[in-house]
Amino acid sequence: MPRSLKKGPFVDDHLLRKVISANEASSKNVIKTWSRRSMIIPAMLGHTIAVHDGRKHVPVFVTESMVGHKLGEFALTRTFRGHVKDDKKGRRR
């Protein structure tokens, strides 16, 4: 179920403070965060936010089409290595 509109988007306070201070200083430094649950707001446009995926920080450049999504959607936590093309061991004759 989506979040109620009367509540507004959720953004962690520490991340919001970093984004606002970066906007005031007009700096484009990478903002490092562990807050995957925070929603992307228009104030974050043009910034590169390094989102933690459980192992490392993945840089995410925020564009206009990402507004309204959560930061964790753009930093995948699982690596898919692919299926084996032709597995002769598991096949019965």
Curated annotation (Swiss-Prot):
Organism: Clavibacter michiganensis subsp. michiganensis (strain NCPPB 382)
GO BP annotations listed: ribosomal small subunit assembly; translation
Gene name linked to the record: rpsS
Signal peptide stretch: none
Keyword vocabulary terms for this entry: Ribonucleoprotein, Ribosomal protein, RNA-binding, rRNA-binding
GO molecular function annotation: rRNA binding; structural constituent of ribosome
Annotated InterPro entries: Ribosomal_uS19, Ribosomal_uS19_bac-type, Ribosomal_uS19_CS, Ribosomal_uS19_SF
Family: Belongs to the universal ribosomal protein uS19 family.
SUPFAM superfamilies: Ribosomal protein S19
Entry protein name: Small ribosomal subunit protein uS19
Origin superkingdom: Bacteria
NCBIfam families listed in its UniProt record: rpsS_bact (TIGR01050)
Function, in words: Protein S19 forms a complex with S13 that binds strongly to the 16S ribosomal RNA.
GO cellular component annotations of the record: cytoplasm; small ribosomal subunit
